Curated annotation (Swiss-Prot):
One of its GO terms (cellular component) is nucleus. It is found in: Nucleus. Its main location: nucleus. It comes from Arabidopsis thaliana. Residues 22-44 are annotated as: Disordered. This is Putative B3 domain-containing protein At4g03160.
Length: 192
């Protein structure tokens, strides 16, 4: 570990002491009854977060994406969250039939750390980079997210009732002064 900075060592020691995020499975059969619900106040019983994080070749292993927020993710003139191509592709494949994003993108619900629903748009840029836009700025402000110190854990799933693609994002703040190396992030978070 000769090429690791003191900041990275400190961050790794803090990150490795964290418990794994809690995942929950919904194994109950859906009932055929029609019921109305308020999309703004959806409880976790209405969300289906089971095999959405699995890839076909890794059945049983839940998937999440963890990212350190960068300057461009919170910058006033940009305000979009860039997501990794491969992890998002694996999660989309695991969700089965996928909607076409088209040039306008796909409207998605993003549930924040407090369970609040934020409307955003998932787009794929020209080089294939997935981004969350149109609402990301408010999300950043709502949770007072900052570059480098905030790390996001992102889950992707289908809503149990609407079957629409949704995201759940949790944030954890660490005493980090700069960007951690990709190698350290991959080791700590074990991104797919």
């Amino acid at each position: 570990m000769d090429d690791v900075t003191p900041d990275e060592l400190e961050a790794v020691s803090v990150l490795l002491r964290l418990p794994n995020p809690v995942f929950f499975d919904q194994e109950e059969e859906e009932e055929d009854e029609e019921e109305e619900y308020d999309e703004e106040s959806v409880c976790e019983d209405d969300l289906e977060v089971k095999s959405c994080m699995q890839t076909n070749e890794n059945k049983g292993k839940k998937r999440k994406v963890a990212e350190q927020l960068m300057d461009s993710d919170v910058k006033d003139n940009q305000y979009r969250l860039m997501l990794g191509k491969e992890p998002v592709k694996k999660m989309m494949d695991a969700l089965g039939k996928t909607e076409k994003l088209g040039t306008k993108g796909l409207n998605v619900s993003v549930y924040g750390p407090n369970g609040e629903n934020h409307k955003m748009v998932l787009k794929i840029w020209i080089k294939g980079t997935p981004v969350l836009t149109s609402g990301w700025k408010n999300f950043v402000k709502s949770y007072k997210l900052e570059k480098h110190v905030d790390f996001l854990t992102i889950w992707m799933f289908r809503h149990k009732k609407t079957r629409e693609i949704c995201f759940a994002i949790d944030s954890t703040r660490f005493p980090v002064k700069g960007t951690l190396s990709k190698r350290i992030l991959q080791e700590v978070f074990k991104n797919p």
